[in-house]
Amino acid sequence: MDESDLYRKWMRLVENLEREGIIKSEKVKRAFLRVPRYKFVSDRYKEYAHVDEPLPIPAGQTISAPHMVAIMLELAELEGGMNVLEVGAGSGWNAALIYELVKREVYTIERVSDLVEFARKNLERAGYKDKVHVIWGDGSKGYPPNAPYDRIIVTAGAPKVPEPLIEQLKVGGKLLIPVGSYHLWQELLEVIKLDEDNNTKIKNHGGVAFVPLIGEHGWRE
């Protein structure tokens, strides 16, 4: 399947997500059209990139289903110039979408070294080499060198909200994170930092299924 066929199928998926009310804003739609998922999966999975399901990536991990990525990006309410940290680089796809929404360098942190390399290669091929920085480290600790953040988006499920992530938010900043069980079921939480004492307001957006967040402030291996 050549790239024009892949892109036509991708456009149809984006239109379906918009019709279903999952993609709500023109800016998220525009980002999805600029950053098709097939550029961030292995060759054997490119023909399935338009299917609204998770797909395998290296190290036993997955690239999220497009509808889940769209839901989180809409909830994030990203604006131009925002400082954003992503926890869990995976394939690099979500970080590239974030860049398209904020038009500012994005930092994404990943603990699995094979995925660090996978994401970096994908981002370089897609034209984001100097726009998205993939850091190797424990994402449950955040990334203090570039804090404070307007938004932190976590793409793995935690047992509880990691305190370092709240500490690294700006007052008024937002954290999106799945919290719940180790496997298969969490609740997507929207956490707003209210003050410098790290008081928060939390909204529950319902059930989701993500791989576990492994780290000092996440799950143990």
UniProtKB/Swiss-Prot annotation:
Any GO MF annotation of the entry: protein-L-isoaspartate (D-aspartate) O-methyltransferase activity
Pfam family, one: PCMT
EC number: 2.1.1.77
GO cellular component, as recorded: cytoplasm
Active site per the UniProt annotation: S64
Localization annotation: Cytoplasm
InterPro entries: PCMT, SAM-dependent_MTases_sf
Entry keyword annotation includes Cytoplasm: yes
Gene Ontology BP, a term: protein modification process
Paired cysteines (S-S): none
Similarity remark: Belongs to the methyltransferase superfamily. L-isoaspartyl/D-aspartyl protein methyltransferase family.
PANTHER family attached to this UniProt entry: PROTEIN-L-ISOASPARTATE O-METHYLTRANSFERASE (PTHR11579), PROTEIN-L-ISOASPARTATE(D-ASPARTATE) O-METHYLTRANSFERASE (PTHR11579:SF0)
Official protein name in the record: Protein-L-isoaspartate O-methyltransferase
Originating species: Thermococcus sibiricus (strain DSM 12597 / MM 739)
